[in-house]
Each structure stands twice: as structure tokens, then as C-alpha cells.
From Swiss-Prot:
NCBIfam families: RutD (TIGR03611)
Keyword Hydrolase: yes
Domain of life per record: Bacteria
Keyword Hydrolase set for record: yes
GO CC field: membrane
EC class (word): hydrolase
Name assigned to this protein: Putative carbamate hydrolase RutD
EC number, UniProt record: 3.5.1.-
Alphabetic keyword roster: Hydrolase
GO molecular function: hydrolase activity, acting on carbon-nitrogen (but not peptide) bonds, in linear amides
Family the UniProt entry places it in: Belongs to the AB hydrolase superfamily. Hydrolase RutD family.
Amino acid sequence: MKLSLSPPPYADAPVVVLISGLGGSGSYWLPQLAVLDQEYQVVCYDQRGTGNNPDTLAEDYSIAQMAAELHQALVAAGIERYAVVGHALGALVGMQLALDYPASVTVLVSVNGWLRINTHTRRCFQVREQLLHSGGAQAWVEAQPLFLYPADWMAARAPRLEAEDALALAHFQGKNNLLRRLNALKRADFSHHADRIRCPVQIICASDDLLVPTACSSELHAALPDSQKMVMRYGGHACNVTDPETFNALLLNGLASLLHHREAAL
């Protein structure tokens, strides 16, 4: 699996791995790259079955497989210890990595994540699946911003959204791959295992997230032994895109604090 690695800003700089959500594209994290590159070696990638890592996914494709193939690719690149920043599905992959490779994951940042899918989130995906089946890729892509962004943010950026729609449609991961990745997301359940995650965790959520209620992050915070929760008042599900200044400040402070906390505990 192809990875994109930034040059380390200094010798032995900590590594931060960015894992996007259901869309799977590493470019999702573009608003974070410039600030992270100054302090960390950053790893981005298109998830298997998407972008520049095309593949046909098995029907039983799982979050555990997503975690294993990423860890194997990191080890092959010479990276054995790393922090993880995951958004939604990416946060699930991050938790799986922390469970399966505890010696490798130094810190976990969960952005609008959850322990197991909330009934509201499931309802949103049911609607989106119906759109996919009835209207194809174009209907899925055109509806997606409604679940990602605040209404006023979208209204002020209509040309940008049109361009994003065209790009997303041109690089659509395919109906079968999308549904198999979505099914993996829906099956994931960390409610009985989260207390085994021992690395420090930063939880970031947005209070106006239409797709994932903030209660999901509260449940995560209660279940994870060493976690802290930060709530953004604005930004929607893709708060790192819509309000990168606020998000980046939270992320940079959290990573620095938790990595120091981790090293002090060793």
C-alpha cells in the first residue's frame, strides 16, 4: 500500500499518521499538513480500495484489516512507533491499531469518532445508501456535503463545493468498495474493548456535527482510561476543514501534551 511521507523536520522527529474517514482520501487532511510538517514527520495515504491504492475489497472487509494493512505498510517504510489522528472511520482504525499494536501507537486522536455506531448515524447512512442505490455515485457525492459541513459554510462556498463534487465523482471509489467499507464501519464495536487502550487519547468533536452526535465522544471519553475531550462549538462533521484554525490549535496542543505525557510515563 502506497504511503505519502513528509521529510522529518529534525532527526528522530515523532511520526503522526493521518487516517481519513469513509471517503478514504489522504487529501482530506490538507488543512493540517502545513502546521504538522513543522513539528512531525507526517504520513498520509489513500485507504485500500480508494485513490492511488485501488483494489477490490472482500465482502467481509473489516476495520481490523484496515488497521493491519496500514501497520504493515508503516513497518515496511521503517516506521515502528507513531501517533494516530483519525477522523470518524479513521478513528475506529486508530482504536484498532492501539488495541492490536500497543507498542507502536504512542498517542491517539479521535475526531468525531464513536465506540459503536449511534442510531442517528445509522439512520443517516441508511438515507445515503438509498440515494446511492437509486441515484448512483452522483447522488451520493452531491448529498455528502450536507452531512459534513455547516449550512452557512456551504452557502458561502458554492463554487468550491461544485468543484469538490466534480473531483469526488471523478475519483469515486466504486459502489461495491464503498458499501464494503461502510459495512465494516457499521459492524465495528469497541464498547467492550476500549478500556484496554492504554495510550493517551485526545477526543475532538464538534457540537454541530449533523452525522455523529457529540454524545458519541462523551461515551468514548468515559470508556477510555487515559483520555481528554475537547468540544468545538462550530465546524460540523468535517470541523478540521471548516475551522482549521481552531482545530489545528487543539490538535497541536494535544499532540505535544500527550506525547510528552507518554514519554514521561516510560
